[in-house]
Amino acid sequence: CPRSVKRVTVNGHEGTLVDLTGIAHFVVEGVEPSEGFFRAAESIFSGIAGLDACGVIFLDVEKRSMIPLVKVIETDSLVWEGSCGSGSVACAVVQSERMENGGFSCEYRQPAGAVRASVERQGGNVIAASIGGEVTLDEPMRITL
């Protein structure tokens, strides 16, 4: 469940910063996915204690799709993720912001597949969150080096 949720504006684009403790995501709509936008947003994560990773989630509500760009703090690496469970939860938190009580669930299409994120709210607060989806395994392959 989120430690904090707040509206933030970056380069004229309003989005929602969701702190999930250890990882935080800035969920934004109507922005073309780019490393440049991540760099512009990066400073909004600086005041959050104990982050192992942070990301910008480029959300398209109409298509129910998202593209996650995540930075791992320790290695200073920026990665276009194929799928992101915590980013999916952040999107569900954002999309359910106006709910006082009840559940919200959405399957978010991502570059490597779909992840279903669900949140339960009580008194306006998120009291439970979960993710799920189909998992497939490819045939093992052997590589000789």
Q: What role is predicted for each listed range?
A:
Residues C1-S83, A90-L145:
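Active-site proximal loop and beta-alpha junction motif in alpha/beta enzyme cores
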